[in-house]
């Protein structure tokens, strides 16, 4: 929140814990890539709230909707200039697929009904993957914008919005016990990496680690650490706030070292 507010932008947080309708859906089944899976109450449970934003803003104005693990390294105001006025929303594409974790939405045009979308998801009428990449809304016009607005775990001179996409290496969690399910891994994959480690072969520590790991890119780690330190120095949050979040295992003390 601080990384955006320091540029004078108003920020509103959408919280799963404050949305009773969505809370009632947690730990129920959805379709994901054609297979039924549990929509768990973990680090990713907030993702569905992306589709509430236009309604929450009374279908007015252009609004920037981001995941909580996206940080503004520069003022993102230019995104408005890069948005085509004929488009419903603007976002970054990866592998020719639009990404919904960062969207500039023209809320006057995008009339998503959150309850209908969520009910359709949990009634198996929409696949989660189709929801995340907008296939559920075929009439939507999407403006493709630069990756600098959703830079996945890398920083360069052009980066405006940094997205720490790999949950297990998010810098503010380093060293804490992981609190999410590795849905993309099979038990066999995990077992295989354990065996490789035991016999001394090269293995993927992310597959088997029970703790959050150090981010592999020191520039990304330093950017995030600097934002936390800057916010602390400006009394954006108190030492009491920090102690509370550390006690609740939401942040690691390492982020302030």
Regions found by a protein language model. Give the residues of each.
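Short alpha-helical segments and helix-capping/turn motifs at coil-helix boundaries
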Residues: 1-2, 50-51, 146-148
């Amino acid at each position: 929140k601080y990384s955006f507010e320091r540029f004078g932008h108003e920020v509103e947080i959408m919280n799963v814990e404050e949305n009773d309708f969505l809370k009632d859906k947690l730990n129920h089944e959805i379709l994901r890539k054609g297979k039924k899976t549990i929509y768990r109450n973990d680090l990713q449970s907030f993702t569905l709230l992306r589709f509430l934003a236009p309604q929450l803003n009374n279908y007015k104005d252009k609004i920037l909707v981001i995941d909580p693990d996206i940080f503004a390294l520069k003022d993102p105001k230019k995104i408005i200039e890069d948005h085509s006025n004929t488009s419903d929303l603007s976002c970054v594409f990866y592998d020719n697929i639009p990404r919904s974790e960062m969207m500039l939405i023209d809320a006057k045009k995008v009339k998503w009904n959150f309850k209908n979308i969520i009910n359709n998801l949990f009634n198996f009428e929409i696949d989660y993957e189709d929801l995340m990449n907008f296939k559920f809304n075929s009439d939507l016009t999407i403006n493709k914008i630069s990756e600098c607005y959703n830079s996945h775990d890398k920083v360069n001179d052009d980066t405006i919005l940094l997205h720490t996409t790999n949950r297990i290496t998010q810098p503010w969690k380093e060293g804490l016990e992981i609190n999410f399910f590795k849905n993309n891994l099979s038990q066999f994959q995990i077992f295989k990496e354990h065996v490789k480690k035991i016999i001394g072969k090269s293995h993927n520590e992310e597959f088997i680690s029970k703790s959050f790991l150090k981010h592999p890119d020191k520039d990304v780690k330093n950017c995030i650490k600097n934002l936390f330190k800057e916010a602390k120095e400006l009394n954006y949050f108190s030492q009491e706030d920090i102690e509370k979040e550390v006690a609740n295992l939401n942040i690691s003390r390492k982020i302030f070292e």
